[in-house]
């Protein structure tokens, strides 16, 4: 513990020294990060964070017939189907915030909430289409990316072991004012991480990244921060490689999104979330590569493998019949 504190102290001192020696780069990175937050992050994310928590609070515990078969396949507790809407429409980290709020309200057990984190935190369509439509000559590429993103997240929900637990416990939801206050706190945390990582990327771009091939440079930026990674994809000339990189970055979310999620989720372990993101990244890379190289047979094979794994997981975990809410 003492050694870790010592290393943190050295790192903080080194960071302050870098800021003093090259303040212009830090200021440029901070300005770029603030502009990114004002122009893209806040408009595409803040309304979805508020609506995601309100939606999950209003519908949590209520059965949504069209989504119930999907919930059963994903081994979700009965009554939590509304979290899928937040997971696939809200954007990072709206899905994780909705799961965390359900856990904090006592509607979800800790184990169920931690497992849901593995596939309920994804890029939203507002961000995905806003970022990717200008990157590809055909708008169909953006739809393909979204489809692969959703399919890989669903695959994670099937592949990660678990069993359908008891229905959610209905709790009285918080006030709308409390929801908005919480959303503002989450939004401020998200923007702080975006600005910090934009400064880090500015230093790396100035000192190291310009030496690397464009594909590697874009991949490194995407692993650090998703928005900047997507903006840097124009450096990659091959549209096929660009789509594969974009698919992987959207699935992984980047270190910045991970820190946003960790900061927004309290009282839950993140091990299953990390595992889920790695699995989603692998699935997205495989499916996007199959799509751009026209290896369409990979998709049915992928479906068969996931289906077989579903049967195996049911045998391992047992089939529990949930009681209706």
Task: Give, region by region, the residue ranges found by the protein language model.
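Long, highly hydrophobic alpha-helical transmembrane signal-anchor segments
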Residues: 13-64, 119-141
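Transmembrane helix-loop junctions in multi-pass membrane proteins
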Residues: 20-31, 56-63, 130-132, 200-212, ...
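N-terminal membrane topogenic signal
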Residues: 1-10
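Selected transmembrane alpha-helices and immediately adjacent juxtamembrane segments
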Residues: 10-21, 30-42, 46-50, 143-212, ...
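Alpha-helical transmembrane segments of polytopic integral membrane proteins
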Residues: 44-52, 61, 95-99, 125, ...
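Alpha-helical transmembrane segments of multi-pass small-molecule/ion transporters
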Residues: 48-49, 100, 114-172, 260, ...
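Alpha-helical membrane segments and immediately flanking helix-loop junctions
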Residues: 73-136, 220-235, 244-279
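Transmembrane helical segments that form the transport core of multi-pass membrane transport proteins
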Residues: 60-63, 180-250
């Amino acid at each position: 513990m003492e050694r870790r504190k010592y290393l943190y102290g050295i790192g903080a001192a080194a960071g302050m020294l870098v800021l003093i020696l090259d303040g212009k780069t830090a200021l440029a990175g901070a300005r770029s990060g603030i502009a990114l937050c004002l122009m893209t992050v806040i408009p595409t994310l803040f309304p979805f964070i508020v609506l995601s928590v309100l939606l999950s609070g209003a519908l949590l515990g209520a059965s949504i017939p069209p989504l119930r078969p999907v919930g059963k396949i994903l081994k979700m507790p009965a009554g939590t189907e509304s979290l899928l809407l937040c997971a696939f429409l809200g954007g990072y980290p709206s899905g994780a915030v909705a799961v965390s709020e359900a856990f904090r309200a006592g509607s979800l057990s800790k184990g169920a909430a931690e497992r849901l984190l593995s596939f309920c935190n994804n890029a939203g369509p507002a961000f995905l289409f806003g970022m990717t439509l200008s990157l590809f000559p055909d708008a169909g590429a953006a739809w393909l990316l979204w489809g692969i993103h959703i399919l890989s997240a669903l695959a994670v929900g099937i592949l990660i072991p678990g069993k359908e637990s008891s229905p959610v416990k209905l709790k009285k939801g918080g006030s709308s004012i409390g929801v908005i206050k919480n959303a503002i706190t989450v939004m401020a945390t998200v923007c702080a991480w975006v600005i910090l990582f934009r400064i880090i990327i500015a230093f790396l771009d100035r000192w190291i990244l310009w030496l690397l091939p464009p594909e590697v440079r874009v991949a490194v930026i995407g692993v650090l921060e998703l928005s900047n990674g997507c903006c840097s994809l124009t450096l990659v000339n091959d549209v096929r490689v660009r789509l594969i990189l974009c698919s992987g970055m959207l699935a992984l979310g980047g270190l910045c999104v991970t820190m946003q999620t960790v900061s927004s989720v309290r009282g839950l372990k993140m091990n299953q979330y990390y595992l889920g993101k790695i699995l989603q990244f692998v699935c997205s890379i495989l499916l996007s590569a199959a799509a751009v190289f026209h290896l369409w047979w990979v998709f049915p094979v992928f479906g068969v493998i996931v289906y077989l794994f579903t049967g195996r997981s049911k045998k391992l975990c047992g089939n529990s019949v949930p009681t209706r809410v």
